Amino acid sequence: MEKQVYITEEERAKCKKVAEAFTELYEMADIVVVDVGRYGFVMLKYYMPPHGFEEDETYTDSRALFEGLWQEWLDMKLYLMAKGAPLLEKGYKGVFASLPEEKQSILIGRKADFAERAGIDL
C-alpha cells in the first residue's frame, strides 16, 4: 500500500525556509513550526502543560505558511505594544490604526524583511 504524500519536496524545502525565517516569533510566543514529513508543516500554538498545544494548523504551501506566520508575528508585536493598556480592547486592527504612521510603516516593512529571508515574493 502506497502512502499518500501531501507536500512536494520542492514545497517542503520552501516551507522549511519560511519556518526558519520566523525564529524571532518563536522566542516571543508559545509558537513553533514542525516539519511532519509527508504531511507538511504544522504550526503549534499556545503551549499549556500538561496537555500540550491548544491550537495547530497544517500547511503544505509555503505562501500560506508565510502569511500565517506573518500574521502571528504582527499580532504578537501589537499585543506586546498594547499589553496592559485599554488600547487592546480595540483589537489588533485598532491597536495598529492607533499607532503613528512611522511605527505602522516600520511594522509593515518587517514583512518585506521576513519575505526576503524566506525567499517569498511579495
At which residue positions do the language-model features occur?
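Negatively charged, low-complexity tracts enriched in Asp/Glu with abundant Ser/Thr
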Residues: 1-29, 119-121
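Short, flexible active-site loop motifs that bind/organize anionic cofactors or intermediates
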Residues: 2, 54-56
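Short, exposed beta-strand/loop patches in secreted or surface proteins that constitute
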Residues: 22-24, 32-36, 58
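Short aromatic-glycine-(Arg/Gly/Cys) micro-motifs in beta-strand/loop hairpins
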Residues: 29-53
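Alpha-helix N-cap recognition
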Residues: 61-62
